[in-house]
Amino acid sequence: MNHKIDRDTYIIPPNFIESGTFFGGMFKARNVIEAGILAFAIGVPVFSLLPLSLTARIIALCLTALPAALVALIGISGESLSSFLLIFIKYLRNRRIIGGNSAEDAVPAAEHGGKHIKKKVHKPDKAPRRSRRSGREDFPAEFDEVRSYEIRQKLRPVKKQKPAKEKKAAKQKKKVSKERKVKRPIRTQEPKPACLNPVADYLPISKIENGIIYTKDHRYVKVVEVVPINFMLRSAQEQRNIIYSFVSYLKISPIKLQIKVLTRRAEINRHLNTVRKEMEQETNEQCLLMQEDYLQFVQQIGSREAITRRFFLIFEYEPWSNTKRSDEEGEAINALQSAVHTATNYLRQCGNEVIVPENWDEFTVDVLYNLLCRNESAVKPLSVRAQEVVAEYLAKGRDSEIDHIPATEFCAPKSIDFTHGHHICIDGLYYAYLLVPSDGYKTQVPAGWLSLIVNAGDGIDMDMFLSRQPKETIIQKVGQQLRINRSKIKDASDTNTDFDDIDGAIRSGYFLKEGLANNEDFYYLNLLITITASNEEDLEWKVSEMKKLLLSQDMNACTCHFREEQAFLSALPLVAMEKKLYERGKRNLLTGGAASCYPFTSYEMCDDNGILLGVNKYNSSLIIVDIFNSAVYKNANMSILGTSGAGKTFTMQLMALRMRRKNIPIFIVAPLKGHEFHRACSNVGGSFIQISPASPHCINVMEIRRVDRSVNELLDGPSIQLSELAAKIQQLHIFFSLLIPDMSHEERQLLDEALVRTYNTKGITHDNASLEDPAQPGQYREMPVLGDLYEILKTSKETMRMAHILNRLVNGSASTFNKQTNVRLDNKYTVLDISSLTGDLLTVGMFVALDFVWDRAKADRTEEKAIFIDECWQLLSGAGAAGVRLAGDFLLEIAKTIRGYGGASIFASQDLADFFDLDGGRFGKGIINNSKTKIILNLEDDEAQRVQEALHLSDAETMEITHFERGHGLISTNNNNIMVEFKASPLEKDLITTDRRELREIVERKRREQSTSAEQQI
């Protein structure tokens, strides 16, 4: 097997502009200056004012000035001492609780360790003109804003200086006129009443209209949801194509992008509600027990293991310089709609779909609600929350405001606690933030490297910010910095510790310069990680584990202590990262490096109306599949491939039991080890039909079965009546080709004539009306059996050979085939066991069972049904025989046409050589190609190579297949491959397990139960 690694590597160069350093790059210049000032400020008074001896003063300096200087030199949490003190003072000024049950302005001191903590009082904005400017001051200037501002200043006429007295008089005059002048706001808005929830006022969101978030600093933000793909299991070539497509999007995307990954416990309430509705319709008590067990199992696994992720692409409107303020809103709406359309088209080339909701406003509010109220949204949908908010407004007597309730009221949490420096608390959930600093990135990364963070686990969210910079300015800065660094390295010795840093900066500069010359764009990347937990201990543990995970990948992360509020606001889907955090974490990269951060890498399969298969091994999401959903899957067929002992029978029965729970008729054809299906069949009230020489069950292969066509006639109207006799004889030719593989063309013709004569003896002709029994209206006549055909074949020398071969089924050991049908297929769970048949009879028996089931499946096109064909290679064995080719065509017919009858065919095979070799692989590959969903279990190396070629799997996927443990597999559907661990409840496991050790445990447990029951009776 070829395991050659041909994955592309992308470069994320170090920042080409770094702050100055001293002492060979050991300390930052700011830290050294602050340490010197602090040491001087402390040392001079200590040394000069204390009336002590020289030794005592030196000791005093070592105890005071030296520690302070060392602290300033090293810094705190990566910040300089002065910067940290400013952050801490700002935190002390702003620490508060917003919202909560108390309406007072201050929280009692006893609740917070004796400290008087004020709640934030929200004041209306007095200067709307200035708010727009001040809101943008926290963010880096875009494009040539600074340069254009300087040019405008230079072009303005220079005013002559007035004398001081004239200036003073002018100021007083201006002040008086200002007081008399009535202020006019730039933007006419209706005065907004205060929200009932203070948190709703606190959030930097003005309103949500037209699917757009209007921020309080007058920006327009759009949020769209993106469906991810299973990127990491794609081949190297597929990954390369996806990255190229993402590069194309980045080149024409908005200047600022925020990609948010929201992780939470799986939302399974809709699936559970579907299960409960199905339980109400179930009449079989044994199936009800299975459904209750399934319900408990899904709740258990959903609360303990299952995780779901949502991916959001967020961008803002970028106004042109010539846009009029009056037209800005309309221009923003059109521009953002165009941006959504562009993202949809380009991301579709990557394999991603952009979800287009019916109501954009409701979708946007729901996103914010799920983000801000994680605990509440898990149990209370947005519609219920909206009703509660309306009820609160009515209770407060604010009936007139019902139609104008701010959108933030529906999504804001009840309270936010900013009183802790290391975390914040929102409605009982604890939040902490990690920032990847500028020097915390790897220089060489593979495509999709962010999947490490995306799939980190429950309670780990990620925000990625990309900001495209003006190319002309960056080229100028890179050239200037290159010249500075080259002059530095001339003066530095190669033994200095900062030599490598300068050399790296020079290499980075040349890399950026070359990339910019090759039409790449320049970006700044920021990564912010949100960690949530239900208590402080879990939060600290998750923060520690996340740091370890990043360190294992040569990455680094720093905490946002005393800046948790700024991190919280930055993590909102508003494309607005706080300036200090932005500067601390920005890392320069080119378009290729930005595309390597492709984050939509965690594919999930979760259909609310489906059946649970297991848990995704890579991201712990639930795999709930509804193969009958024609909007997602082109057909409901499935192929299960695996070596002996890999778990094919277990997987088949697990699916069959869970489909039966959904009231879907199940038919299982078991050519080998049919007894393994008996335990589950009997425990759900199913019908176990055993076809063997020693069994009383019989299926008359010559029976023309009555098919209910009432549904088809209602759908299509009266149809052309085709001869049912001709169709049956066509099927019988396949049967006899399997029974007599060396049948000549002449014998085939004579057999056809004999079959027509046999049916004629019972009064059946090509006229369908002849099938009706005159004595019993509504029923068919008594059908001929093989013995009737045998008698006709004996009458001619030309057909005597066929009669001798048929004699075994008429008068020999397999005479059970020579009886009328005495079984029914009206049970919802039917197993046809033909494992007692051996040799050529096994193939014949398998065809008889399939023919019987196929007639039943074609009855009602509106009814979902599933046919499980275990070890289908048995029907395809003996390559080269004409009969086997007919049998292969019959299987292909089932695979190709069952979709039109509302059904699904699930094929399982372990002998892949026979499966793929017959007729050059036409039948095996035909079945695979007509199965939209494939489940690949453990395979040997040579078999894995066959499957790799047939399914176009990557080397990584093929290697995984050869190392699968029992109960693990790969699901391939809709161009996505998912590694899954199949999960069964204890009750299901007892019914379908074939493991010898587990069977022994079941036997011992039942014996203990019997002995306990016997003792109780005594």
Where in this protein do the model-derived segments appear?
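Glycine-rich phosphate-binding loop of nucleotide-binding enzymes
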Residues: S19-F47, I205-E209, Y214, V247, ...
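H-loop/switch region of ABC-family ATPase nucleotide-binding domains
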Residues: S909
